[in-house]
Amino acid sequence: MDYKLIAIDLDDTLLKNDLTISERARRAIKASISKGTLVTFATGRMYRSALPYALELGLDLPLITYQGALVKYADGREVYHRPLDLNIAKEVINFVKPFGLHINAYIDDELYMEDATDWGKKYASIAKVPVHFMQLPRELKNDPTKILIIGESEELDQLALKLQKYFLEAINITKSKEHFLEISHPRATKGNALKELAESLNIKREQVMAIGDNMNDLDMIKYAGCGVAVGNAVEDLKNIADVVSKSNDDDGVAEVIENMVLKA
């Protein structure tokens, strides 16, 4: 198959465990772009946190960020923004606060939290973005792009079930990492964003490749003509993927691009 569009997750997929892009992956991506294949990111990261990696690779396609809630070019042109309704966001935060979990809110591509908890400090060090503080939800005045809840995996799994039961289809709930539970606009998913991007470029579904590692990648892996799970992906994602490559630290992304795009 001649793949014309590749969407790649960042954390635990393209990025190594030290949060860098390997030289081999860099070469493979740039070679595929030179061949005429379009490449973008599909990440839960903030736009400003994903942007340095896009600039490093010279990507000129819209970047799918915030799990699909914000799609924006590296030069700043916005394709669309689907934030969480302010009243729903406040209701979610009030629902979650009694559980004592860390909460992040994202407004205008800025990170807000109430306190510099250990979870908050760790997140900020990974994202490499400034932290702003506000009382949540009282000081929340604008629709947030998403809400992120951080805590122990089992607690988040139980909370997700309760949120789903209470809010039904008013929100999208996804687990992006073991300790990250993300709440966003119901249509803000990587799969929806990738589908809209492919259609805007007149690229057929079977000509799309998507590469990821966790359950927030599930709908884009299902949508793509070739859904790839890296070797360190969760088992549920591996089970539905068309291809399972090596792990993020063993150049799984580079391997699949070399074998399925560059050699095609």
Regions found by a protein language model. Name each.
Residues F95, F99-I211, M215-Y223, N232:
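Conserved acidic, metal-coordinating active-site core of Asp-based
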Residues D18-G120:
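Active-site phosphate-binding/coordination module
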Residues D2-N17:
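Asp-based phosphoryl-transfer active-site loop
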Residues S32, T43, Q67, I147, ...:
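Residue-level signal for inorganic ion chemistry
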Residues Y223, V230-A264:
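Asp-based, Mg2+/Mn2+-dependent phosphohydrolase catalytic module
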Residues L57-L59, Y66-Q67, Y166-E169, Y223-A224, ...:
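Short, structured coil segments at secondary-structure junctions
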Residues G36-T40, D60-L61, K146, E206-Q207, ...:
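Short active-site oxyanion
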